[in-house]
Amino acid sequence: MSIFTPTNQIRLTNVAVVRMKKGGKRFEIACYKNKVMSWRSGAEKDLDEVLQTHSVFMNVSKGQVAKKEDLLKSFGTEDPTEICKQILSKGELQVSEKERSTQLEQMFRDIATIVADKCVNPETKRPYTVNLIERAMKDIHYSVKATKSTKQQALDVIKQLKETMQIERAHMRLRFILPAKDGKKLKEKLKPLIKHTESENFDQELEIVCLIDPGCFREIDELIRCETKGKGTLEVLSLKDVEEGDEKFE
């Protein structure tokens, strides 16, 4: 006896569903549990480790696959992999209230850990503990966004915490060595991007050791490469400039 199975139905088990409404229709993708947040945070980069199948569904639990014409109309493409990426990034993860609560608590902790790792008290150059950052986040009533990466949210938290406490991103320590003919002109262009100059030696070449905001690194690197046509050098001496010692602000 044969059992008829419709070709547009796929049965899946132990699945995490991510849903998106677009063009008046509901679309879903089937993912492995615990992998959706890893993808969104950037920890997991292999799509095949996240998706149980590259198919796009109208309803995962019923195994109903979306029609190609609906995909084209709503997403402007029939490429299931590209559509899966869109839904994975912007869709809503369907979880129980208990699972959602646990997930958000973990993200809250992860965000606080990133902030504590990247920041210091600007007056003392001492780092803050994760617990203190968590308390500060609660004081400003920070609400975790499940669809946004923890790294991006950490940057948002730093901006908000600056309004209520002494905090800033720890500076990077750099050394540039610039050809003499480019040195003076390039130094003027670099000035606005430098927080503090520790030393400056001008002999046959211009050598500067300085502190910068990590957010300026890419611009500085590009400026030196372009202006010196690859003859200048840029060396990262330390990723975080903090005071020596184990003391942390509680």
Swiss-Prot record:
For this record, an example GO cellular component is: spindle pole
The record, for SUPFAM superfamilies, names: FYSH domain, Hypothetical protein AF0491, middle domain
**Spans through the membrane:** none
Residue positions of the PTM N-acetylserine? 2
Q: List the disulfide bonds.
A: none
Write down the Pfam families for this protein, in alphabetical order: SBDS_C, SBDS_domain_II, SBDS_N
The record's listing under InterPro entries reads: Ribosome_mat_SBDS_CS, Ribosome_mat_SBDS_N_sf, Sdo1/SBDS, Sdo1/SBDS-like, SDO1/SBDS_C, SDO1/SBDS_central, Sdo1/SBDS_central_sf, SDO1/SBDS_N
User: Per UniProt, which keywords does this protein have?
Assistant: Acetylation, Cytoplasm, Cytoskeleton, Nucleus, Ribosome biogenesis
NCBIfam families, per the entry: RNA_SBDS
What is the name of the protein in this document? Ribosome maturation protein SBDS
Lineage per the UniProt record: Eukaryota, Metazoa, Chordata, Craniata, Vertebrata
Which gene name belongs to this protein? sbds
